[in-house]
Amino acid sequence: MYLLIDVGNSRIKWLYGNKVPSTIEAVSYKQDWQMKLIRAWHLLPEPEAIALSSVNKAEITTTIEEIVRQLWHKTVKIFVSQKQTNHTLTVVYQKPEKLGSDRYLAMLGARSLCHDPLCVVGCGTAITLDAVDGDGRHLGGFILPGMRLAENALLQNTQKLVPMRWTPHLLGNDTASCISAGIHHALPAGVDHIIDELEGQCGYYFKRFAFGGDAQILFGNRPTYRIEPDLIFGGMFAHLSPPKQV
């Protein structure tokens, strides 16, 4: 069994198992997350291996490594984006280690599900998109503010507090619902537009995957998108798998 850990911007998620889907647990940084990890992991049988992806501060990774050492006297494998992985994915970045490990693992996870050209959309603090062709070549990507960042940008100079209400309606009828409608519809529409343009340039269609905490809100009602909440963990398993023979 593996213990796989995803250190995000707002919470830590982990999976104990040998495949996806499996039960995924999480703790917010607003809680006493160190103690919760110790209490939860103390109940687990010793994992065969422990691996971690992080987009947060190095101090959090260091704390988790210390917890793992205390519990099992094991080291933690830290995922870093690579130029080539198991004959499955080739990253376009000149310095692949600069690519966020969450984006890298999400592409690997999608490639484990589909070998067609694909786009992977991350829906968290930021909206990220990465495109991969049918041969596993990473074509590049983009990053936009996520829902909460967009909301904060609109409200930061507002004198009064505006309680947000997420709405499926195209138009709002007060300030809160107008902001909600704008963000809710503009973000996925912008992503759609970029993918449509990319398809026109490349001359073929891309399968569309979405993952992250806001994936269902933003893309759940769009039938062209496949919502895969466990995509990063799927990428971890793909990375840890033995290389395929070619």
Curated annotation (Swiss-Prot):
InterPro entries: ATPase_NBD, Type_III_PanK. Keywords: ATP-binding, Coenzyme A biosynthesis, Cytoplasm, Kinase, Nucleotide-binding, Potassium, Transferase. It is an enzyme of class 2 (transferase). It is found in: Cytoplasm. Substrate binds at Y93, G100, S101, D102, R103, T175. It holds the Pfam family Pan_kinase. Pathway: Cofactor biosynthesis; coenzyme A biosynthesis; CoA from (R)-pantothenate: step 1/5. The active site is at D102. Its EC number is 2.7.1.33. Homodimer. Catalyzes the phosphorylation of pantothenate (Pan), the first step in CoA biosynthesis. HAMAP family: Pantothen_kinase_3. Belongs to the type III pantothenate kinase family. This is Type III pantothenate kinase.
